[in-house]
Amino acid sequence: MIRQCLGGWLLALSCVGNAMAAGPDCSRSFTLALHDHGLLYSVDTDSGIDKDFADELIRRSGCQIRVSLMSRARIWKLIESGGLDFSLSGIANDERNEYADFAWYFSNKYYLLVRKDAGIHRLADFEHNDQFQLGVIRSFRYSDSANRLVDKLSAANRVSQAGGLEPLYQALILRRIQGMIIEPFDYPAIDEKKIRDVTTIVEFDDPAVRHGLIMSKKALSPAEREKWRALVNEMRADGTVRRIFEKYFKPDLADSMVDFKTQP
């Protein structure tokens, strides 16, 4: 009897040890930065999708993670240098893949928000009028067609950069820019009458772009990045990510954003 109890106790300890080994190494504290961007995170309310996601990531990992607020441009610089462990809702490109790894948890499309009085009905209308200025957030990248538009207009000095959404909305209202690139997280601000009444949306003919937990390759080993990716995948599999998105979007839109293939 004693031998059976001892065997069961050792098995339990073994299971606990394996579970701890499978999770992230919490022997040090980590850093994670949010950025102020619509429904992803609002500094005014200290709430948003990425805030909820970060809270759940901290709870599940059991690690100490210091959360701060930064501009997107600073986030990418610190991720590259290893001065920041994590950020959220990031998208990949060839340059970023050199220094960052990603754990995907949603995807969304991008749209061109333009002034009605500019007479823009398709992308070519914007691209071919030298008087039109495009507003973007510094260090943001978008879908393929949107990126091509930004790069082409940047080369012609037709892009105005800002640190966040609010300055771009103001520039659009004041006719300093004729368009800006948006995503579903920006919808509440666009629904405000002063913006809705003067704008319309032009679609990019692009598929949805995956967004994920950003992990610094310099700060985190490949093995540890896989452990954090496994946590994110668990949050997707058990419906946690979906429940977070349904707090902020109608179910059909939430479904379209969280249902995607993890592999290209």
Where are these regions (language model features)?
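Extracytoplasmic small-molecule ligand-binding "clamshell" domains
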Residues: 22-91, 95-98, 161, 238, ...
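Acidic, polar ligand-binding/catalytic clefts
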Residues: 55, 64-128, 139-142, 201-206
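Short loop->beta-strand "edge-of-pocket" segments that line small-molecule binding or catalytic clefts
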Residues: 28-43, 124-142
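Short helices/loops that flank or line small-molecule/ion binding pockets
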Residues: 68-69, 73-85, 125-127, 165-186, ...
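Ligand-binding clefts/hinges and TM-proximal coupling segments of bilobed small-molecule sensing domains
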Residues: 64, 141-157, 232-264
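Periplasmic-binding protein-like
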Residues: 34-37, 108-109, 193-232, 251-264
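Extended ligand-binding regions for polar small-molecule ligands
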Residues: 51-60, 124-133, 140, 214-252
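Ligand-binding cleft/hinge of the Venus flytrap
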Residues: 54-63, 104-105, 127-130, 139-162, ...
